[in-house]
Each structure stands twice: as structure tokens, then as C-alpha cells.
């Protein structure tokens, strides 16, 4: 059934504190917008500056993010970039294990999300490696066992909107109304997750995934509408093509555009989590926006 939206109720919004139960039983409360730092233990992610493929590079990346004040680390061992090399489950697990060992040597308190669409990878990352959150770009569509695993390990789940898979997702950009259709599709999945007993869910509109340039900015403009789910909202636009195509530059030059969108997402859209390559810049955005909000 299509979602009925009263647009007047959601013209703008602000950050709402939220809590999540971690697999180890901890209840973690987040009182301000969170900065999620990207750790790609891959050789072929779209932004070269995010690639940390050997132990020394991973060590340096983790140390830098921690020094810059990262709140959550998002580790991925399989690039979702179109055209990326296929990676076996065994290789993805090997990469993640290497990265998780280094992360947990540096910190045991900061939550770690594992960026994977494979249920067995998610299970082992949570139950054996010490990850806390499952970040699934497919929303459960690429592995039918994913939600069963998330329920069994009692992990918070990032539900992202995407149609198809990273190779063919741009073949599925036909929407009657992009925001309403994305909301409706996410709403259907939320109902299924609720039936399975999965409660701690973060919503990701899926910027850049099965959306055209114009559709990405329509979603950004309509971000307040995503609060109808009363869930934390993750925004992942860091150095993506929705920035580089509009500004005619490259991902290496995408920090200014990323900062602009993150500011809009926080100030106008009430974003809960910013997923970024550049932790220090995002922390500054959060600090400025929070100071502005709380000023008399």
C-alpha cells in the first residue's frame, strides 16, 4: 500500500538523540549527530584516498580517524563501485579480519559497522571479529539470509535503498516520484524487519544508488520526509558522483561539495549520521551546526 505523506508536517527538522542496543548488550546513546569514518580495506574503491589495503595503511587510517574524533568506523572489504573486481567471500572475510584486528587493538569502545551485503560475512564480522552494526547497501535484496542473520546476532541494521545491484542499479531509475517511491519501498522493508523482530534500524536513502543526478538532489531536498519513520537517518554522499558531476570535478576535489551537502543534511534534514571519508571536516560541520541550533 502506498505511503500517504503529509508534506506540510515535514518541511524541516532537527537532529533527535537516539539509542541502539549492541550485540554485546551495551545500550549506546548518541546525543549529537555522529561522524562515521569510512575504512575501505580494498584496492579499488572509487576514491583513492580511502583505500587502505595493507596493514600499515590500515593502521595509519585508523589512527588518523581516531585522532580526528570519529564516532563510528564503517569497514568494507568489497567495493560497491560499478565495475569493481568481484571478490570471493573468503577474500572479503580475510580483508575484514585484518582491518578489525587493527581497529580493536586501537579501540574497543567505538562502534564498528561492517559494510557487506553477504549474510555469512555479516555473521562472522559480528560474532567472531567484534563488529557491532550491519551496513547492507542492498537492504536485504542480494542475500535472502541477511535479515535472519541480523536478527540472530542482535545487531543494529543500516537499511539502505537501492534497486538492482551495483552493476545494474542505474537501469532502475524510473520513479513516478522519487521520494515517495523510495519512502514506500523502505516502508515495506521496515514492516518486514519489524515482523522479524529487528528493532534498531538506521535509514539510508541511498544517495547515488539507482538514482540520477537530479533524483539525488530531490531526495536531499525532501530529507525531512524520511523522519516519518522515526528512525535515525544516515547520509552517505562523501565525494560521490552527485557532487563531482554537478561541479565538473573529481572525487579528489570533492571535499567542499561534500561539506556543503552535509551541512544541508544536518541543518535542514536532521541527519543522524554522516558517513564520510574526511572525519575532521565532518566533525567541524557537526560542531558548527550544533552551536547554531543551540544558540539563543
Roles of regions detected by a PLM:
Residues 36, 70, 111, 131-132, ...:
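Hydrophobic "anchor" residues on beta-strands that sit immediately upstream
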Amino acid at each position: 500500500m502506498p505511503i500517504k505523506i503529509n508534506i506540510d508536517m515535514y518541511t524541516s527538522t532537527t537532529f533527535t538523540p537516539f539509542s541502539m542496543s549492541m550485540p554485546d548488550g551495551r545500550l549506546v546513546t548518541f546525543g549529537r549527530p555522529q561522524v562515521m569514518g569510512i575504512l575501505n580495506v580494498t584496492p579499488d574503491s572509487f576514491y583513492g584516498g580511502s583505500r587502505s589495503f595493507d596493514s600499515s595503511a590500515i593502521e595509519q587510517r585508523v589512527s588518523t580517524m581516531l585522532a580526528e574524533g570519529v564516532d563510528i568506523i564503517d569497514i568494507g572489504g568489497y567495493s560497491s563501485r560499478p565495475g569493481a573486481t568481484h571478490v570471493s567471500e573468503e577474500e572479503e572475510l580475510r580483508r575484514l579480519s585484518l582491518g578489525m584486528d587493527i581497529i580493536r587493538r586501537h579501540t574497543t569502545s567505538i562502534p564498528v559497522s561492517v559494510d557487506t551485503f553477504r549474510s555469512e560475512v555479516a555473521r562472522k564480522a559480528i560474532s567472531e571479529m567484534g563488529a557491532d552494526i550491519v551496513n547492507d547497501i542492498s537492504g536485504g535484496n542480494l542475500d535472502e539470509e541477511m535479515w535472519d542473520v541480523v536478527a540472530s546476532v542482535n545487531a543494529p541494521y543500516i537499511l539502505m535503498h537501492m534497486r538492482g545491484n551495483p552493476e545494474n542499479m542505474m537501469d532502475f531509475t524510473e520513479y513516478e516520484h522519487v521520494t515517495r517511491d523510495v519512502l514506500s519501498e523502505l516502508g515495506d522493508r521496515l514492516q518486514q524487519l519489524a515482523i522479524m523482530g529487528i528493532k534498531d534500524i538506521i535509514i539510508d536513502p541511498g544517495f547515488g544508488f539507482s538514482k540520477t543526478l537530479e533524483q539525488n538532489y530531490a531526495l536531499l531536498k525532501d530529507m525531512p520526509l524520511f523522519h516519518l519513520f522515526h528512525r535515525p537517518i544516515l547520509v552517505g554522499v562523501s565525494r560521490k558522483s552527485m557532487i563531482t558531476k554537478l561541479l565538473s570535478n573529481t572525487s579528489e576535489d570533492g571535499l567542499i561539495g561534500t561539506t556543503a551537502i552535509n551541512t544541508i543534511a544536518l541543518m535542514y534534514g536532521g541527519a543522524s549520521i554522516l558517513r564520510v571519508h574526511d572525519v575532521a571536516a565532518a566533525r567541524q560541520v557537526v560542531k558548527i551546526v550544533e552551536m547554531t541550533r543551540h544558540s539563543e
